[in-house]
Amino acid sequence: MLEVSNLTAIRDERVLFENLQFEIKPGELVQIEGRNGTGKTTLLRIVTGLGDRDEGSIKWKGEAIEKSRDQFHQDLLFLGHQTGVKRELTAFENLRFYQSIHNSDSSSERIFHALTQVGLAGREDVPVAQLSAGQQRRVALARLWLSHQILWILDEPLTAIDKQGVKVLESLFSNHVDNGGIVILTTHQDMFADSPKLRKIKLGD
């Protein structure tokens, strides 16, 4: 379980959010929503341990993330605005590298399946530097199909993704939470419309 208590973030003397408090349990799909500038990305970066908070605490499985950093990072998959893919490697090589550092199943079949799911079949051996920005984003998203991590934190994962791609990701997110995972995301897309699966946390007015 992820526990956020009394979280406050101030940037350039402006309070983005104050005394924010929530718990997210396994099996939950949560969307952080709010207008631009309300601190959605800041919140995700703080929760992952990449950003600084002014007050408050964050616990994962009952322990402060500062004290259980290794375990927390083993359980976490974070996709931010930067794709994190290596431009000099191909799409396939990027996913092989990802698998190697996370000690996950390194079968070529799983990699090809992941790339097919994000619409990159036939582009496996193209250097990422030659792919469009949207395709580079898809290489990063393909990691989700290879992930064994419980906690997925995704900042605008649907950027440059078409309607069919959104449906594929909706299905993936549903399966992940149905199997006891947690998904926390920001998006401007209308996902899971009227679905009881989706819980929303709103920042700002």
From Swiss-Prot:
Pfam families (alphabetical): ABC_tran
EC number: 7.6.2.5
Entry's Gene Ontology BP terms: cytochrome complex assembly
Catalytic activity: heme b(in) + ATP + H2O = heme b(out) + ADP + phosphate + H(+)
Family matches, as InterPro entries: AAA+_ATPase, ABC_transporter-like_ATP-bd, ABC_transporter-like_CS, ABC_transptr_haem_export_CcmA, P-loop_NTPase
Binding site for ATP: 34-41
MF GO annotations: ABC-type heme transporter activity; ATP binding; ATP hydrolysis activity
Keywords associated with the record: ATP-binding, Cell inner membrane, Cell membrane, Cytochrome c-type biogenesis, Membrane, Nucleotide-binding, Translocase, Transport
Disulfide bonds listed in the record: none
UniProt domain ABC transporter: residue ranges: 2-204
Compartments reported by the entry: Cell inner membrane
Top-rank taxon: Bacteria
Gene Ontology terms: cellular component: plasma membrane
Membrane topology: Peripheral membrane protein
Main location, first listed in the record: membrane
SUPFAM superfamilies associated with the record: P-loop containing nucleoside triphosphate hydrolases
Function: Part of the ABC transporter complex CcmAB involved in the biogenesis of c-type cytochromes; once thought to export heme, this seems not to be the case, but its exact role is uncertain. Responsible for energy coupling to the transport system.
Protein family (similarity comment): Belongs to the ABC transporter superfamily. CcmA exporter (TC 3.A.1.107) family.
Assembly behavior: The complex is composed of two ATP-binding proteins (CcmA) and two transmembrane proteins (CcmB).
UniProt protein name: Cytochrome c biogenesis ATP-binding export protein CcmA
Organism: Vibrio vulnificus (strain YJ016)
Record gene name: ccmA
